[in-house]
Amino acid sequence: MASLDKNMLLNYVPVYVMLPLGVVSVNNVFEDPEGLKEQLVQLREAGVDGVMVDVWWGIIEQKGPKQYDWSAYKSLFQLVQECGLKLQAIMSFHQCGGNVGDVVNIPIPQWVLDIGESDPDIFYTNRSGTRDKEYLTIGVDNKPIFHGRTAIEVYSDYMKSFRENMSDFLKSEVIIDIEVGLGPAGELRYPSYPQNQGWVFPGIGEFQCYDKYLKAEFKAAAARAGHSEWELPDDAGTYNDVPESTEFFKTNGTYLTEKGKFFLTWYSNQLLNHGDEILDEANKAFLGCKVNLAIKVSGIHWWYKAQNHAAELTAGYYNLDDRDGYRPIAKMVSRHHASLNFTCLEMRDSEQSSDAQSGPQELVQQVLSGGWRENIEVAGENALSRYDATAYNQIILNARPQGVNKDGPPKHRMYGVTYLRLSDELLQQSNFDIFKKFVVKMHADQDYCEDPQEYNHGIPPLKRSEPKIPVDVLNEATKPIPPFPWDSETDMKVDG
């Protein structure tokens, strides 16, 4: 292997691998440490920098309010440390089960579900009244209905307890990333396309703001705007519609009217504010730790090439050809010294069926460029498991869109990429051989580098968030700016 070249190291993009969903069981048991250790040793030998793991609220606080049990996760983290890997920990305040690739079922804590029995409006709700129990509605963020605590206080207490109980791993800088879950699948979005309610790709999804709390907030906002007669949309169709079959999204539809724009601005602002408030709590909880805070944004690539961007709009990303729905999120993230994690890095437009009007490549370019323009770090992951050179090459291209620079840092470089996900299939000889090549190419043909400072990733102690940015200032970032240029293919192919 080549020794470490100082200039080439500045092109190094660390690679993490997501651990299996059920590594800690729903009963809070670390199931198969020996089996996992074998796999982690293989990852370490392949040059992988670290692993990512969901730290499930539904496992840790399942016994009752503030009754946390971190023991199984401590054993897991100990093993990761012994194997010489870094850790990205996700504060997973959502249910596992009901989304793409969910093979395990981990509901949110039973005592929270019990509150939902008497008050089902704590859950996101669509227009027909179906509740989604995978994550609490934004409407209860500041409602003290969880045994005297608000939802945000519940999340905040959980993160503080994590810091207290995992202080050894934080001090030894084994844990380098805290990804703060902000919605279903841990993503800052509404649960607009739930498979467990019958959604199938490429359905436009549904708005999820019909619980009594969000409904009341919308009515109050409409009244303040002098339109107390305005109601939430009733013409946006159902999960598996195409945009043109709905009054809301069709050409010259409701989404372009004053009322439609008011609703979409309100709906997306709710999400911005939700992320902002919880990141503020995360920043307080981990203040002074040498960790990166991160949030995850979903790659909703279907209907991206349609004028209405319907699937993005129902998820809360108010993104149109003349309005950037992602840069305001990056601006919000920037005040907390946090980074943005994006998905679908492996996808190419040519692999998508034309009737979904899908644009994953343009979407990735838009979101990454927006993050870089707001001076934040951007990381990412693949959306679906892939083991082929084409997918790996696409990820490498997105990680360094203008290629490597042999004389220093490249023009743009992603902060890291997390591969989804560790499995027996990944470790099959032929699959693992190409994965190992992928790691080497992400590392710019350099050996594994133990010290992140060598590739400009030293992590300073987390500083306190900057002052709150008013939402109308955040929304100044909706002005579209063309993305940075992207090479047509990577200069570091796994099969080159």
Swiss-Prot record:
EC number: 3.2.1.2
A Gene Ontology molecular function term of the record: beta-amylase activity
Reaction(s) this enzyme catalyzes, per UniProt: Hydrolysis of (1->4)-alpha-D-glucosidic linkages in polysaccharides so as to remove successive maltose units from the non-reducing ends of the chains
One Pfam assignment: Glyco_hydro_14
InterPro entries hit by this protein: Glyco_hydro_14 (IPR001554), Glyco_hydro_14_CS (IPR018238), Glyco_hydro_14B_pln (IPR001371), Glycoside_hydrolase_SF (IPR017853)
Keyword entries, A-Z: Carbohydrate metabolism, Glycosidase, Hydrolase, Polysaccharide degradation
Disulfide bonds: none
Superkingdom of origin organism: Eukaryota
Signal peptide: none
Binding site for substrate: 54, 94, 102, 296, 301, 343, 382-383, 421
Broadest EC class assigned to this enzyme: hydrolase
One Gene Ontology biological process: polysaccharide catabolic process
Keyword match Hydrolase: yes
Active-site residues (renumbered): 187 (proton donor), 381 (proton acceptor)
Family (UniProt): Belongs to the glycosyl hydrolase 14 family.
Protein name in the entry: Beta-amylase
Gene expressing this chain: BMY1
